Structures are given as structure tokens and as C-alpha cells.
């Protein structure tokens, strides 16, 4: 009887421990989900200052890696190869993005954005969403939003399709066409085409920038607008 009672007590203790472990795991998941939601909400709040400017039509240049292309018939062509999760790409965009926008809107240069996805699944989702925004004529502002909320940790779970749709809505892209395009991954073939074309153009990392076919290299650790601007103007 004593042995049976002891065995019963051991079983009871074991189930209590299992239940406690399960509770800790479930609680951790719940807090993790709520924590991620809070972080997402806080990040999206940083988009409050980004409002859609007039739409700018782009095309997909399949001869140049399925780049999102703004062809203005200008003498200068700039190719930008980037991955949306790349922190150095954010540095480049923070320094030179507004200047590139003005070149496009004022038709002073042709600009091709090659959106890559080699940093992981979230890069694929962000690139797909970027192509979807381009279909709406709103790539430039969505591009700005991407870097405004870029996570400091790659593949952190931040860039879900839902978050990318919410990003679009936050800056004014509210069409069901955009939402469907993002959630269905409608542009992943174009995303893959960009990645497949890297070797053809000698691209080994991001950001990589070409001005009239010549690779541009910064001379300082930081990206300096005046340096990039001078290189563009020199052609």
C-alpha cells in the first residue's frame, strides 16, 4: 500500500510539473505575441509623417533583373540593388532616398530599383509588397516606409503580410488589390527574377549602386549626400 501510495504521489507530482511547464510555455507565447503586437503598433506609428505623394508610374524591366523602373528618357540611369532587411541599405536610403525621389519626380534621371531577398523570408515578403505598391503607382512612398520601420533584427517576425498591408494602409494605400497582392504573394516570381540576375550584373551584396553602368563606391564609412549627388551629376 505504501509503495502504491508513493507511486500515486509521484505520478501526481509529475503531472503537476508537466502542467506548470505547459503553462509557462503558453504564457510565454501569449506574452511574446502581445509583445510583438505592441512593437508593431509602435513601429507603424512612426509612419504618421509619411503621406502619399502623387502616384508615379513605373514599369518592370525584365531585361535588367525585373527591376522597378522609372524611365524618364534622361541621360543618367541609376541602378540600386538592395534588400529591405539590409541595415546598410537603410543607411543609403536615409542619406540619398529623398534625392533619388526628386530625380524621379522631376524626370532628371532614370532609376531602377532591384529589390532582393537573400536575407530571408521577410525580405521576400517585403519585396513582394514593394512590387504590389509599384502597381499602385506608390512604390516611392512605400519604399520610404519600409526603411522607416525596418527592424534592427533580421527575420524577427515583424514583416508579416498583415503588417505589410497595415503599412500600406497607414500611408494611404488602401485598395483591396494591394492587400490581395501582398497576402497572395502575387509578385514572388519577380522577386526571384531579381535575385537570379545578381550574378549577371556582378552584384555580390547590398547596397550596390551603378551610375550609367559604372559601380559607385563611397569613399567614407557613412553615406554622404553631396558625394553621391556629385557622382550622379558627373554621370
Locations of regions flagged by a protein language model:
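C-terminal cap of thioredoxin/glutaredoxin-like
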Residues: 1-48, 169-235
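Short extracytoplasmic/periplasmic juxtamembrane "stem" segments immediately C-terminal to an N-terminal membrane anchor
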Residues: 43-64
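A short beta-strand-turn-helix
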Residues: 58-76
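A generic local structural motif
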Residues: 63-67, 96-98, 195-197
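Extracellular/periplasmic catalytic domains that process cell-envelope and extracellular macromolecules
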Residues: 72, 104-106, 122, 200-204
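Structural alpha/beta surface segment adjacent to cysteine/selenocysteine redox centers
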Residues: 79-84, 90-163
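Folded interaction domains in cell-surface recognition and envelope-stress signaling
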Residues: 131-134, 143-148, 152-193, 197
Amino acid at each position: 500500500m505504501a509503495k502504491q501510495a508513493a507511486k500515486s504521489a509521484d505520478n501526481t507530482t509529475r503531472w503537476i510539473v508537466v502542467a506548470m511547464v505547459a503553462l509557462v510555455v503558453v504564457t510565454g507565447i501569449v506574452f511574446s505575441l502581445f509583445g510583438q503586437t505592441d512593437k508593431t503598433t509602435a513601429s507603424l506609428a512612426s509612419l504618421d509623417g509619411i503621406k502619399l505623394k502623387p502616384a508615379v508610374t513605373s514599369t518592370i524591366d525584365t531585361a535588367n533583373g525585373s527591376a522597378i523602373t522609372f524611365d524618364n528618357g534622361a541621360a543618367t540611369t541609376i541602378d540600386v540593388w538592395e534588400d529591405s532587411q539590409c541595415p546598410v541599405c537603410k543607411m543609403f536610403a536615409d542619406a540619398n532616398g529623398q534625392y533619388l525621389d526628386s530625380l524621379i519626380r522631376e524626370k532628371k534621371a532614370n532609376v531602377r530599383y532591384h529589390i532582393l531577398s537573400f536575407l530571408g523570408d521577410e525580405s521576400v515578403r517585403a519585396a513582394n509588397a514593394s512590387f504590389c505598391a509599384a502597381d499602385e503607382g506608390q512604390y516611392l512612398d512605400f519604399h520610404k516606409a519600409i526603411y522607416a520601420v525596418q527592424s534592427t533584427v533580421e527575420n524577427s517576425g515583424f514583416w508579416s503580410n498583415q503588417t505589410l498591408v497595415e503599412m500600406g494602409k497607414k500611408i494611404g494605400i488602401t485598395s483591396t488589390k494591394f492587400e490581395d497582392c501582398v497576402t497572395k504573394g502575387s509578385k514572388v516570381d519577380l522577386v526571384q527574377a531579381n535575385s537570379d540576375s545578381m550574378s549577371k550584373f556582378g552584384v555580390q551584396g547590398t547596397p550596390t549602386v551603378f551610375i550609367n553602368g559604372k559601380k559607385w563606391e563611397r569613399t567614407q564609412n557613412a553615406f554622404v549626400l553631396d558625394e553621391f549627388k556629385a557622382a550622379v551629376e558627373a554621370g
